[in-house]
Amino acid sequence: VEVLRLLGVVEGNGIGQFNPYAQLTRAEFCKMLVTLMGSSDVLRYKTVTIFPDVRASHWAARYVNYAVRGEKLLAGLPDGTFQPDRAISYGEAVTILMRLLRTDADAASGGIWPEGYIDLAKASGVSAGVELAGGAAISRAQAAQLFVNVLGAKATSSSTDKDGETSTTTRVYNPANCVSRERVTLIALNGNTARVSGGKKNSYDLVRPSSATVLNGLKGDLLFDADGK
């Protein structure tokens, strides 16, 4: 959760609580998804109305519209609505994330939905630690785990050239707001700065202050945007 918070993907409820066991809505999932992608194009979709229940005045309109029309990662329901406040299911979540990773989603969609996507998510590591029935609602904590898994997931896709030769490409997903990373061990100096072991610099200033107790001793990747922050 802390990694996602530093990237701006997750937030508290206004009083500093994450509410890990609360169900995540379709609108909230779209916000997490689009924030992770880090595209500035999302602002263009703020005043667009695609669904009658997600008008331009809706708090999540820009995120829903961009995910649907801008990236075509998901769609509305057969009745033309989006149902932004309905809990998102595990099957819906992994389908969207596998499309984000540009894996062999076309092959998965040829089977019984969402089993093909669930199998892809398991094979790529996206669903590690979160394996549910396709129709089960996911919690905020489970969604956070899925998004953390996406950051390190290896996406595999296949293509066939004009001569009939098939090639497979494997890559690690790298969102627009995370252009580089360093494997480090954090040693907190204060709420604004962390000293590290294994990074290119001895210390880093944090964009979002954290308590020393949260940072101290953590091991993992530092994620950097285009400005090196």
Where are these regions (language model features)?
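N-terminal propeptides
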Residues: V1-G228
